[in-house]
């Protein structure tokens, strides 16, 4: 079992966590020309696009 040899300080762990950022998905253009978020159904046409 993996056990840390030394305690990791709060500052050090916080610095490491700064790189775990949430990336926002960019909108895509649907077949009818409207912009929507990916992996969602278009309410106008009912189409699903990645």
Swiss-Prot record:
Positions the record marks as coiled coil are: none
List the keywords (alphabetical): Ribonucleoprotein, Ribosomal protein
Region: Disordered; residue ranges are 1-50
- Which Pfam family would be a valid example here? Ribosomal_L32p
Q: Which GO terms describe its cellular component?
A: large ribosomal subunit
InterPro entries the UniProt entry points to: Ribosomal_bL32 (IPR002677), Ribosomal_bL32_bact (IPR044957), Ribosomal_zn-bd (IPR011332)
Enumerate the Gene Ontology biological process terms.
Answer: translation
Basic residues bias locations:
1-26
Q: Which family does it belong to?
A: Belongs to the bacterial ribosomal protein bL32 family.
Q: Would you tell me the protein name for this molecule?
A: Large ribosomal subunit protein bL32
Q: Which organism is it from?
A: Aliarcobacter butzleri (strain RM4018)
The beginning of the lineage is: Bacteria, Pseudomonadati, Campylobacterota, Epsilonproteobacteria, Campylobacterales
């Amino acid at each position: 079992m993996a056990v840390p040899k030394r305690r990791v300080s709060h500052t050090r762990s916080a610095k490491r966590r700064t790189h775990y950022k949430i990336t926002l998905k960019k909108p895509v253009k649907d077949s009818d020309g409207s912009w929507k978020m990916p992996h969602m159904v278009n309410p106008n046409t009912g189409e699903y696009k990645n």
